[in-house]
Amino acid sequence: MSEDQPHANGAYYRRVLLKLSGEGLLGNKEFGLDLEMVDRVAGEVKAAHDRGIQVCLVIGGGNIFRGISTAAKGMDRTSADYMGMLATVMNALAVQNALEKRGVQTRVQSAIPMSMVCEPYIRRRAIRHMEKGRVVIFAAGTGNPFFTTDTAAALRAVEMNCDAILKATQVDGVYSADPNKVPDAVRFESLTFTDVLTRDLRVMDTSAIALARDNNIPIVVFSLHTPGALADVLDRRGRFTEILCDSHQE
């Protein structure tokens, strides 16, 4: 990431990983996909792509199936997590379809091979896709149970040499508490990874935070529900929280 001046495309990033929660694709529904929301997300990704920014995505599956909560109700955790991974593939295919309807060549790569549906995850191929101007969506998490899609996002961001992880959430940054439950919760403009861990702010799970910290990849948290928010983040405008290594925090 360039902290002083933007790249030739006008943005401060060359290659980013966008992390979307499955719940973010619900829209006003209680379950499944809101296709209008999927299309809006695709429009924001296309706008970034059209500026020459290389974009890859990791999408959760909580709108369809949540492995952790299902395991808590009695299902074997491993089986529940694999079902959750399959839900992420469904979401990835939906976003791929929306992007390609807008003329953006998109590839889905799954950590669990399913050759009739999408490509297997191959690091060099994914990088080459982005270099050729394609969007890449990584599905099925890490391919292993007991790892969240947040951890998968951090892992893929490291493997893809991304400049930042852009985490789209239900709120416009990181707060001291859930702003929907605590009206006077404080929103942070910037934090260090140490802040996140010591204050237990639950931005991502600790393994994802550790991966990003150890590889010096900033995390930018912003609202999925604000139109144009992705473009604003790419220009370092608007409302968001940036999480940096301690050495970058003034």
UniProtKB/Swiss-Prot annotation:
Cellular component terms per the entry's GO annotation: cytosol
Gene name, Swiss-Prot/TrEMBL: pyrH
Annotated binding of UMP, by residue: G61, D81, T142, G143, N144, P145, F146, F147, T148, T149
Source superkingdom: Bacteria
Protein name per the record: Uridylate kinase
Catalytic activity from the UniProt record: UMP + ATP = UDP + ADP
Single biological process term from Gene Ontology: UDP biosynthetic process
EC numbers on record: 2.7.4.22
Originating species: Rhodospirillum rubrum (strain ATCC 11170 / ATH 1.1.1 / DSM 467 / LMG 4362 / NCIMB 8255 / S1)
